[in-house]
Each structure stands twice: as C-alpha cells, then as structure tokens.
C-alpha cells in the first residue's frame, strides 16, 4: 500500500477525513500544514505574514520530498496549495475532496476563516479556488464527492482502495 494523500481546497474536510482513515486503516496520520507549523514555530497564518508565501511553499516542497522517503504507508492531509508542486506526483494515491466554493465557505465559521490567510478576501479566494480546480483534478488518482459529509467521503475512499 502507498501513502493515501488527501488534496483539496481549504475547508474541504481533509484533516477530518485523514483522522477517520487513519483509524479505519490503522495508519499513522500526517498533516503537512501542522508539520511545517511545528518545525517553523509559527502558525500557517504567521508564516505567510512574517516569512511570506514563497517561503511556506518552499517548506511544503521540501516536506513532500521528505515524505517520499518514508518506508511505511501513511494517511497524509495536505494544505490546499500543495498541488502547485510538481514533486507531488509519486507521493502516493491521491484523493481530491471535491466540493463547490459556496459549500466550503458555509462549512468554515468566521474563526476558521481567520486562521486561513488566503481566505481574507472571499472574491480572491473564489478566484484561487477556480484556478486550483484543474490542478486538483490533474493530480487526483480518485475524485471524492465531499459534499455528502465525512462518513460518505470515508466510504468512497475505502471503496476505491478495496
């Protein structure tokens, strides 16, 4: 079994689904944003504000290469922009948690949106969402309809890997 890599826009449920998959499959769960945040000693928002998005993307790219060296399979929850990296290919089986923009925004309360620097301006966030759609689809081994909630997404992933 390869790594199971969850991709999708912020708020699509990657972190929650990763935890459930880890429990169901008895695999360790890794969260790329959390790993970067812990290593740098700043939240993702603080990294963007203090070090810039380019530095965050460099940390992300380096982490992908590092994760490729792990010998045992993991469930990997990724940040929404990870699909911008060519080296994502070969990390594992990727599942795109697809959801429309309006549903994503409804799922995130104000406190959650404040933690996500790229959601500061909803017009710009929607443009970013639309730009990334093709990248998510291009990088996906499987597309998961994430509008049906966590249990439905979990069932879909488990069916694909059965």
Swiss-Prot record:
CDD domains: SK. PROSITE patterns: SHIKIMATE_KINASE (PS01128). Substrate binds at residues 33, 57, 80, 132. Binds 1 Mg(2+) ion per subunit. Mg(2+) binds at residue 15. Keywords: Amino-acid biosynthesis, Aromatic amino acid biosynthesis, ATP-binding, Cytoplasm, Kinase, Magnesium, Metal-binding, Nucleotide-binding, Transferase. Its EC number is 2.7.1.71. GO terms for biological process: amino acid biosynthetic process; aromatic amino acid family biosynthetic process; chorismate biosynthetic process. It catalyses: shikimate + ATP = 3-phosphoshikimate + ADP + H(+). Signal peptide: none annotated. Pfam families: SKI (PF01202). GO terms for cellular component: cytosol. Residues 109-123 are annotated as: LID domain. Its main location: cytoplasm. Pathway: Metabolic intermediate biosynthesis; chorismate biosynthesis; chorismate from D-erythrose 4-phosphate and phosphoenolpyruvate: step 5/7. Gene3D superfamilies: P-loop containing nucleotide triphosphate hydrolases (3.40.50.300). Monomer. This is Shikimate kinase. It comes from Helicobacter pylori (strain ATCC 700392 / 26695) (Campylobacter pylori).
């Amino acid at each position: 079994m390869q790594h199971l890599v969850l991709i999708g826009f912020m708020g699509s449920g990657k972190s929650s689904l990763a935890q459930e998959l880890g429990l169901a499959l008895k695999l360790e769960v890794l969260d790329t944003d959390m790993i970067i945040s812990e290593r740098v000693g700043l939240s993702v928002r603080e990294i963007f504000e203090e070090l810039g998005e380019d530095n965050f993307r460099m940390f992300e790219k380096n982490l992908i290469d590092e994760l490729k060296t792990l010998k045992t399979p993991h469930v990997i929850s990724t940040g929404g922009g990870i699909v911008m990296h060519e080296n994502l290919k070969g990390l594992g089986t990727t599942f795109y948690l697809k959801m429309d923009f309006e549903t994503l925004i409804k799922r995130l309360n104000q406190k959650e949106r404040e933690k996500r620097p790229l959601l500061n301006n909803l017009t710009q966030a929607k443009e970013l969402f639309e730009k990334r759609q093709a990248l998510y689809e291009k990088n996906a081994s499987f597309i998961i309809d994430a509008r049906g909630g966590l249990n439905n997404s979990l069932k879909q992933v488990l069916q694909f890997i059965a």
